[in-house]
Amino acid sequence: DALPIYNVSSFGGASVKRIHRPVNAEGKTVSVGSYMIPLLQENCEKAGVKMMLDTTATEILTDANGAAVGVKATGASGETVTVNAKAVVLATGGFGANLDMVVKYKPELKGFMTTNAPGIQGQGIEMAQAIGAATVDMDQIQIHPTVEANTAALITEGLRGDGAILINEEGQRFIDEVGTRDVVSAAEIAQTGSYSWLVVDQAMADASSVIQGYIDRK
């Protein structure tokens, strides 16, 4: 079934409004991930897809010709789990929470925090390399301009798409807030103290449960 995400806004670098977001019963926008994952899980269950939670993949299995034919993993109780398959789809994400790996490929990011989930350690990449997979553009690590420094909470750029502005220590705007993340981040780093304030108005706060969530988190 299609997910009902009909609120449309702009994100960084977009030439037109094309970012679809969900809303709650009050008509306020809500976080996409926490809204979408339960619905995707429900649809997977309807389709008979078997989900193995708390299970960590450790090795991609290959046949005599080197083709990927399954995965070996460790289950929640420490048991070995083997999944044999006709093919393996690698969709493990990146390595943003593995700060040593980040610095290995992009030394200038040493000292940066991460907004990634703790499990984003790059194991999928390493498993693929172990069976001969090539990598490309490993240094192309995205940094985000709106991160709360004390909690590492990522503040969605959807707020900037809705009209929030960035001001520096001198109280001045310094960039087009809906530029691409690399451009906005570079401009922010160049400001005094390498930080900025994200300013929203009351109308934006009233229309978004996400903003209230940021306030409550502090």
Kindly label every feature range from the protein language model:
Residues 58, 77-78, 88-90, 95-96, ...:
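Short, glycine-/Ser/Thr-/acidic-enriched flexible segments
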Residues 1-81, 98-101, 144:
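Conserved redox-cofactor binding core of oxidoreductases
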Residues 30, 34, 38, 115-118, ...:
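Electropositive phosphate-/nucleotide-binding environments in soluble metabolic enzymes
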Residues 71, 83-85, 176-177:
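Short capping micro-motif at the N-terminus of alpha-helices
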Residues 121, 125-127, 131-218:
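An anion/pyrophosphate-binding glycine-rich loop and adjacent beta-alpha core
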